[in-house]
Amino acid sequence: KECDLKPEEIVAKIKDAGVVGMGGACFPTHVKLSPPPGCKAECVIINAVECEPYLTADHRLMLEKADEILVGVTILMKAVNVTKGYIGIENNKPDAIKLMTEKAAQYPNIEIVPLKVQYPQGGEKQLIDAVIRRQVPAPPAIPINVGAVVQNVGTAYAVYEAVQKNKPLFERVVTVTGKSVKNPSNFLTRMGTPMSQLIDAAGGLPEDTGKVIGGGPMMGKALLNTEVPICKGSSGVLLMNDKEASRAAESPCIRCAKCVSVCPMGLEPFLLATLSAKQDWERVEKEDVMSCIECGSCQFTCPSHRYLLDYIRLGKGTVGGIIRARNAKK
C-alpha cells in the first residue's frame, strides 16, 4: 500500500528501525534524509551498481525483491520531498536491469539508469557524476550540496521493511564466495551470525584458504578468524586461496604514474603514500588525502607492488583525527 506518513514521520520510523547505509559505510540513513540548513534535495539516487568483484548480494536482492525496493525508493523520495528518483545499475546485470525497468514502468518518477561497467562506478561521487552529471566538490562537501541523496539498494529495501512492516534492521543478504568455495551463495543473514556458520553453509572452509576477507577483494579487509560476526555493513565473505592471498614484495616507485591515471578522485597516490610513510601529516592533509575513497585501484595497478592503500589509509585516519581535534577546539 502507499505510504501516507509525513516526511518527518518516515524519518523517525527509519531512525527507530536502525536503518543504515547497507553499502558498507553504515552511515545512519535518517541523518542523510535530514539535509543541513541551506541544502535542498533535488533527487534520490539508488546505488545498485555493486562494482566490487565477486559480490552479488545486491544483484540477488533486485531479482527477488524488485517491487519492495521500488516502494522503498518512493518512501525515500517522499522523506526528502523530491519527485525524481534514479536507480543506477551496471550493464553486467542485464537481468536485473530488465526486471527493474519492467517493474518501474508503473512509477513514472523513477528512472532505471544502466551504467558502464567500470570500477569504482559504485563510489558515491562517481555515481552522482554518471547519473546526473554533477560533481561533488572536495570534502567537507557532500552529495546534498549538489542536490543528491544517495542510498544503497539494500537500504531502500530496509526502508520499505521499516516503514511498511515496522521491521527493524536485523538481517541482510551476504555473499559467501571464492574460487575454492563448493557452493557460493547469497544468504539472508541475521546480524551477529558468525561468519563461520555462513562458510559452513556454503560447503565449509576450503583447505587451501589463504585469507578470509570481509567484503570484496578491492575494499574489503582481511579477518583474523572466521568467528567475526555479520554486521549491517557486511556485504560479503570472500575466501581467497593461497595463490590469490600471496602478496608480492614491495619495490621502489618507478614513477610510471599508473596510480595517478587510475585514481577516480584525481589524487597522486604515490605521493600520499610516501608522505604518510614519512608521517608528514601537514603535507598529507594539504594533498587532499581526505578525498580518497579507498577503492584500491592504485595499489592494484602498481607494477612495483607498493602498499599504497595501506599507507594512505594510515594517513587518512591520522589526518582525520587531527581535523576532528582541531574542530573540537573551535
Language-model-detected regions and their locations in the chain:
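Hydrophobic alpha-helical positions that pack around
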Residues: 83-195, 201-206, 216
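Short, solvent-exposed coil/turn elements at secondary-structure transition points
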Residues: 116-118, 218, 242-243, 278
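Generic beta-strand/beta-sheet core signal
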Residues: 47, 88-90, 113-115, 177-179, ...
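Short coil/turn linker and secondary-structure boundary residues
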Residues: 5, 22, 64, 151-154, ...
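Iron-sulfur-cluster electron-transfer modules
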Residues: 1-130, 255, 289-290, 294-299, ...
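Conserved mixed alpha/beta catalytic, RNA-binding, or beta-rich assembly cores of soluble enzyme
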Residues: 14-26, 37-42, 47-69, 163-252, ...
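Ferredoxin-type iron-sulfur electron-transfer modules in oxidoreductases and energy-metabolism complexes
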Residues: 234-250, 260, 264-330
